[in-house]
UniProtKB/Swiss-Prot annotation:
Matches recorded under NCBIfam families: PRK04334.1-1 (NF003321)
HAMAP family documented for this protein: UPF0280
InterPro entries: ApbE-like_sf, MA1715-like, UPF0280
Name assigned to this protein: UPF0280 protein MmarC7_0482
Taxonomic classification: Archaea, Methanobacteriati, Methanobacteriota, Methanomada group, Methanococci
Similarity remark: Belongs to the UPF0280 family.
Organism listed in the record: Methanococcus maripaludis (strain C7 / ATCC BAA-1331)
Amino acid sequence: MKFFQEKISIKETNILLKVDNPKFFKIAKNTIINERFNLENYILRNPIFLTSYSPVEVLDNAPKIVKLMAEAGFNADVGPMAAVAGTFSQLIVENLIENDCKNAISENGGDICLKCEMDTTVGLYAGNSSLSGSLGFKLKKEKIKNGYGICTSSGTVGHSVSLGNADSVTVFSKSASIADAAATSIGNFAVGNNVDAINKCLEKAENIPKIDGVFVCMGEHAGKIGKIPQFIKTDKKEGLGNVFEMF
């Protein structure tokens, strides 16, 4: 099966999208434009939604993107913007599914939502860690056929806010929105020496519902909790923004 890839950048939203038919790129672009409009307008009326590091109650008539982000924030005890990237990826894939797309991967700064009818390997990018680019997660088609989230937070890579120093905290969940906020929340506990920091992250992860599993990487050390996909050894030294490969 042939796949098509395109980078879509609209303001701060930068999506790397892989689909089985190029007609879906236009649908994805329209989804981003519409959801950005909804989010920006809500923030204009409710600026605390943009700046809060704590969960925020939202209005009953708030748009879907706002409600998803708020729910994810409460689930992980962080501000709603901690879920923004994963929520965009999730809404894109959900909209593509509604338009009969069979295979789609949306990656937004390390926050991935995918729906595939084949086994798919997602590579790990963890900055300067020795594990970066040498490890992947093999997701079975049964797990991802209806949509799935794999989101990564880092205190050493990228511009997103993290209060910890983990090279990567990767969270697996049916919801990319939930996974994104959880990754941020868990990553905030990555303080101290590597072993202690990883243990703190895993302890925090135990108390966050709606996630399947977590993998934490700091330097030469790593830890996991819950159910995560099978590890796959890779030889691809990929950079952020090109972290997945389909088989």
